[in-house]
Amino acid sequence: MTSPTAMPLREAARAALGELVGRPDVDFHDGQFEAIEALVEGRRRALVVQRTGWGKSAVYFVATLLRRRQGAGPTVLVSPLLALMRDQIAAAERAGVRAVAINSTNAHEWAEVQERLAGDDVDVLLVSPERLNNPAFREEQLPALVARLGMLVVDEAHCISDWGHDFRPDYRRLRDLIAQMPADVPVLATTATANSRVVADVAEQLGALPGGAGGAEGVPVLTIRGPLARTSLRLGVLRLKDSASRLAWLLSHLDDLPGSGIIYTLTVAAAVDTARFLRDHGHDVRAYTGQTDPEERAESEGMLKRNEVKALVATSALGMGFDKPDLGFVVHLGAPSSPVAYYQQVGRAGRASESADVLLLPGVEDREIWHYFATASMPDRERAERVIAALGDSPISTPALEALVDIRRTPLELLLKVLDVDGAVRRVQGGWIATGHPWTYDAERYERIAAERVAEQEHMLEYERTDGCRMAFLQRALDDDTAAPCGRCDNCAGLWFPAEVAQTASAQAAASLDRVGVPVEPRRAWPTGADRLDVPVRGRIPAGEQADEGRALARLTDLGWGGTLREIFAAGAPDAPISPALLQACVRVLAGWGWAERPVAVIAMPSRSHPQLVDSLARGLSEIGRLPYLGALEWRGGGPSGQAGGNSVFRLAGVWNRFDAAHLEVPAGPVLLVDDLIDSRWTLTVAARAVRQAGATAVLPFALALRG
């Protein structure tokens, strides 16, 4: 019998493809064998841009099998999401490919993975881009991997490009990895969502040579692009007046949608609230966000794949590469910020079925949310210079650095990654150091990217308004010159979805969105590094100085009261007394609080931005609850100096010893402490400490809004 290595390449590749899909009669899609041939025989660098469901994973698994039979080392597959890794490992196992992963959830398996790699018992190693940039991995494991690397695969390669809809700084480090590799090691990058600008940028990164050269002067990159039309998808847009109407539509028509699917939301709060509402009214759904426990996320993915739930209500945490070929529908409560991002998410549906339904329910709050995420991902010149100045030759951990620069942990980590890619800082064992390399803020570049983001947002609004074919619109957004009318969307074939909403569903949705009361966990420990800013505290906050669990009327991001609260706290909004409706909603929160002991008095926070609002709220709660109103705390020394959005250490330092309760006759009992907006919780923590020291046995914080 002829061995696979002795077969002509196409025959051997087709046999491997048959093993992968379980069908010996299978043949290649257009472009698949061309890519495999380039990798296995040509040992080239290739970029494959093909629609979801085309079979990009088949290319790299088949190429891996053939390269391994040639005696090559393992493939390293860079994959951005845990859900995607799990699906890729399952697909590899079905094909007889030995695949293992190193990620944040399986640290207990790392030693075994290293042993298997050393014993050449691994065909594919899946790693996240963040893991590739981990100092221990980079210094202890990566050199040996690069020395015997059989192939490098970069999945969801649009993440490399800062022009891409989901740019990730850690992906940009792949250019350095590619430059370290021998020129005859094949490299494959795959994506379904790249327009011409992103394709050019990614190809430049793939063509990197040692020393950083690339592009036209680097290694030639083969680009294989195919038509991106998804003929199985039936697209539509339904504009409804508010969040209650959108929830009511889902409640009325979720069971009419085919099979099981995904309901996407733009925020974590919206995902949690929507899932709770649908569950409360009999629908079998689960929430899935970046804040969901990893084990629960894996369980939810499995339940969706087995059709044990009608839907997962998810943020973009469930996105790239999630593999359920028969996914029946995708509904968006709120639009993504670009047609390209939308195409990527709806691409989860209908991969192995003749038809799947895709419906967009846009919201009036979408643009506000887009703006927040767009600005949060852009580096700030002043912050970047502050970070570089704080670092030296000795490693500083992220928590310690947080105590030196007024930046919160998440944006600080993102900024460090950007500066790392730019060569200004470097992550090493023990923290971060400054490299000493000159760094200049590329204002022109970031202005161009910001302008592109705004243009993408306008393009998304055009998608919502277009009277032309929706699939063709998405294809044109991806620079696909094969775009043609699909004949299936609501504009081509007429409305395929019901537009009406049952009155009972509307009433139930309105009641759900009228739900009030969000728990506010008190701070239990002081932040690390407070002493660096002359705040003489560390460790746990003494029990006698802590606040109790508090309440907020709602989060600013909530689907219900969140809209009203966002208007109140919008930049430039005038201060005014609280409205009767808002006051009654607050009374409902207090009525359902269930505190261990009823408060005996009310104290207000001395708000500088909304004094009328806070004073009227405190007085109103005092009158309705028949509790004495003691007045407001006083500032000391001009009030807090910490800026909203700063990190814990600076927020604490900004309000430390600023509150004075000496002028108030604080009783020896629980006190209700009233504020307008809770953000970091440090303001209320320090204020509660002052009230406790003045004689209160407990402090119950209450605010209109909770940020986050």
Language-model region placement:
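Helicase motor core with emphasis on the C-terminal RecA-like subdomain
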Residues: 6-11, 16-20, 26, 30-59, ...
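Active-site signature of alpha/beta-hydrolase-fold catalytic machinery across serine-
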Residues: 61-62, 66, 201, 616, ...
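A short, structured active-site edge motif that brings together acidic residues
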Residues: 104, 226-228, 290, 603, ...
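Active-site-facing substrate-recognition patch
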Residues: 233, 509-601, 610-611, 615, ...
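C-terminal accessory region of SF2 helicases/translocases
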Residues: 309, 335-344, 350-549
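Arginine/glycine-rich "motif VI" loop of SF2 helicases in the C-terminal RecA-like domain
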Residues: 348-355, 595, 624-625, 692-696
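PRPP-dependent phosphoribosyltransferase catalytic core
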Residues: 493, 508, 512-514, 685-708
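Activation segment
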Residues: 679-680
